[in-house]
Amino acid sequence: MKILVTGGAGFIGSHIVEYLVQRGDDVTILDNLNTGKIENLSKVNNDINFVNGDIREYKLLEKLVSDSDGVFHEAALASVQQSLKMKDEYFDVNVSGTENILKLAKEYGFKVVYASSSSVYGNPKQIPIKESDDRSTVNPYAQTKLEAELLAEKYSEMGVKVIGLRYFNVFGKRQSKEYAGVIKLFLDRIQQRKPPKINGDGLQTRDFVYIDDVVKANILAMDSDINYKFLNVGSGLPISILDLANLVIDASGLSLKPIYCPALSGDIKTTQADLTSIKKLLGWQPKTKLRDWLIEVISSKKFECI
């Protein structure tokens, strides 16, 4: 297949690229290197076509997708805290940029699998969260993801093949410093023999899913006969931030206690994915357990894995 990966030098995108190259696909990457890094592609540099550009550049996008079989759309701005200060920029990239891809999909007929987010649910009324549950955002980043979903719905009615994967909290190697998740932040502190810092009371829960499992969900979605759907991608196994901090400390063998800091604006209290749909429709299920991965990384000091 001939595939374009937007944001292909980023955390999730670069792992998708590696999988596609290994499979033998013809892969082009579009990335402006705002948070992505060329070194993330070091394993596949000789097997890809890399274009330094922006998803807001319509003519450039058109040139790249006109003969594509599919697009994995991972390019986005993804910091909740940053979105509070840069609302217009976030809308421009995450909404207008996504619409560019959907417009071109309508014209050229390729399938789109793109990164949505569990943040579209806001603070859920019930746990676990099903795809049919209410969407009620609590920060500008989440609102851009919801607006992109509304566009996907609109374009699907025009015949565009599009699947939105609602990522929960993805962890693994290559997370950028700008968008680092709490696991990376905790492990960075432990590596320095410093205690993890917790924002708020630590009782907020998160649903963590490993990067390799996320890649597999993307591949299955693209290869499926499904033409339109939103699907949760998580582990279905929530853990509180306090329990996560203590797990990291225990695995390190250090005598530390978490440091409590003020809660973050726009933070969600609890989240947990219902995986019924993605298991049924794609035959997907997560394989990597957070606890096992953390113990392996910390006990063997494989901090390059973050």
Residue locations for each model-derived region?
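PAPS/PAP-binding and catalytic site of the sulfotransferase fold
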Residues: 240-252, 293
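Conserved mid-core alpha-helix of short-chain dehydrogenase/reductase
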Residues: 60, 100-104, 208, 213-216, ...
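N-terminal Rossmann-like NAD(P)+-binding domain of SDR-like oxidoreductases, especially those catalyzing
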Residues: 1-170, 284, 306
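Active-site loop of classical SDR/Rossmann-like NAD(P)-dependent oxidoreductases
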Residues: 35-37, 181, 241, 262-277
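Glycine/proline-rich active-site loop of Rossmann-fold NAD(P)-dependent oxidoreductases
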Residues: 146, 161, 170-185, 194-195, ...
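Amphipathic terminal alpha-helices
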Residues: 290-306
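Hydrophobic alpha-helix immediately C-terminal to the catalytic Tyr-X-X-X-Lys motif of short-chain
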Residues: 147, 151, 155, 186, ...
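Non-catalytic, hydrophobic alpha-helical segments
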Residues: 214, 218, 233, 244, ...
